[in-house]
């Protein structure tokens, strides 16, 4: 913890093409070794693939996909009397978005398609249709929270 008061939250600038801070955050999540331009190109090409396949605005599809990925509940470890309990807690809005973006990028990277653009586009499309690995991750997280409901009174 910092000694000089709370750390100021840094705000990202909206991206040039879609004028969205959410897209900028996704670009930053995808970025490897500081290559932001490369990350931007990959995302925009993935959005082009999404709009080709669906005929809809890629931002609409992306927002729907993110909505389907973002968790509402998660479990956090709490130590009580020598035992660790998995306590279900509600996820703050900022963390929900962060987890959604992180899972989207991570599971897109694990897919089998040839290029990252195809992987990302397909993961976005799957998530928008409530399928895919990132949606499964959310379901697993919710199942864990549901299974540990008995420890909800340990919430802090």
UniProtKB/Swiss-Prot annotation:
Any one Gene Ontology BP term: translation
Keyword line: Ribonucleoprotein, Ribosomal protein, RNA-binding, rRNA-binding, tRNA-binding
Pfam family, one: Ribosomal_S7
UniProt cross-references to PROSITE patterns, sorted A to Z: RIBOSOMAL_S7
Keyword Cell wall biogenesis/degradation on entry: no
Annotated Gene Ontology cellular component terms: small ribosomal subunit
PANTHER family attached to this UniProt entry: RIBOSOMAL PROTEIN S7
Its biological purpose: One of the primary rRNA binding proteins, it binds directly to 16S rRNA where it nucleates assembly of the head domain of the 30S subunit. Is located at the subunit interface close to the decoding center, probably blocks exit of the E-site tRNA.
Family: Belongs to the universal ribosomal protein uS7 family.
Record text on subunit structure and interactions: Part of the 30S ribosomal subunit. Contacts proteins S9 and S11.
The protein, known as: Small ribosomal subunit protein uS7
Protein's gene: rpsG
